[in-house]
Regions:
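Beta-rich interaction/scaffold domains
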Residues: 135-244
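Short, acidic/charged, Gly/Pro-enriched secondary-structure junctions
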Residues: 69-105
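Solvent-exposed edge beta-strands and adjacent loop segments
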Residues: 1-65, 99-121, 158-171
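Short solvent-exposed strand/turn elements
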Residues: 117-134
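Short, charged, solvent-exposed linker or helix-capping segments at domain edges/interfaces
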Residues: 71-73, 132-138
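Short acidic, glycine-rich loop/turn motifs
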Residues: 13-15, 87-94, 149, 223-229
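Acidic glycine-/aspartate-rich tracts in secreted/extracellular proteins
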Residues: 64-68, 129-130
Length: 244
């Protein structure tokens, strides 16, 4: 795999702190209001009152990446795992983000034709109601993060690290076999590649073999900083395997 699909909007789908994919469309759960018949025997006409709210299935189309991140979707489906799904908009539109509890109820892969990107459709069935997450959440703080390999070789990041810059690139060594990221945040819960990581502590090593990521290929790693009922901050790091 020489690259990973990437879209421009910066919208992410996360599950329990694990960034699963960048989305290519938005599908909020359809909302219906139950109609309750309250007609009595002496009513001159049928009386209907509003009842319980009901949210329908959400179907998402995402760029397909053949790695453990999206393989987790099938694992969740077969295990009937229920958790909190978060649709995370870019920071400028953070007030549109929302979360909803639910489970994976359908998965469909699409075969690409004529150089179109491979995509995957999957359906989430809500088990409760939608909660808007309109407040911006915590961010990384100085020194933000350190990205390094097993030696360790510390990778130079571009652009300069900042709590409010959300996309970075760097180049690894040719001989790098694993990647760790040490994040720093004064508040919030930090996840690196889906694994909860304490501030100032190296993440679980991310496998980075030459066979899986040959020279020139790109590994994308997400760092997510979350809080309670706030929009998570998502940082995307693209690591290109170097030639030296």
């Amino acid at each position: 795999m020489t690259s990973q699909a990437k879209m421009a909007t910066g919208m992410f789908l996360a599950f329990n702190g694990y960034v699963l994919a960048e989305m290519t469309d938005i599908s909020e759960p359809p909302l219906t209001v139950e109609k309750v018949d309250s007609t009595s025997h002496d009513s001159p006409c049928k009386i209907t009152i509003p009842g319980q709210l009901s949210y329908g299935d959400m179907t998402y189309t995402v760029n397909f990446v053949n790695d453990v991140t999206q393989a987790a979707l099938e694992t969740m489906a077969t295990a009937r795992t229920t958790g909190m799904w978060q649709v995370i908009f870019p920071p400028a539109f953070a007030s549109l983000s929302y979360q909803v509890p639910g489970f994976v109820s359908g998965i469909k892969k699409k075969t690409p034709l004529k150089s179109n990107p491979a995509q995957r459709d999957f359906t989430v069935t809500p088990t409760g109601g939608i909660t808007p997450i309109t407040t911006a959440g915590p961010t990384l703080t100085t020194p933000y993060m350190v990205v390094e390999d097993q030696v360790p070789n510390i990778f130079a990041m571009s652009p300069a690290l900042s709590g409010t810059t959300y996309q970075y690139t760097c180049t690894s060594k040719q001989a790098s076999t694993s990647i760790t990221i040490t994040p720093t945040a004064l508040t919030g819960t930090i996840y690196v590649a889906g694994n909860q990581t304490a501030t100032g502590v190296a993440s679980t090593a991310i496998p980075y073999t030459l066979a899986q990521y040959p020279t020139g290929s790109i590994l994308t790693v997400f760092v997510l900083v979350s809080g309670t009922n706030v929009t998570p901050s998502v940082y995307e790091i693209q690591i290109t395997r170097g030639t030296s």
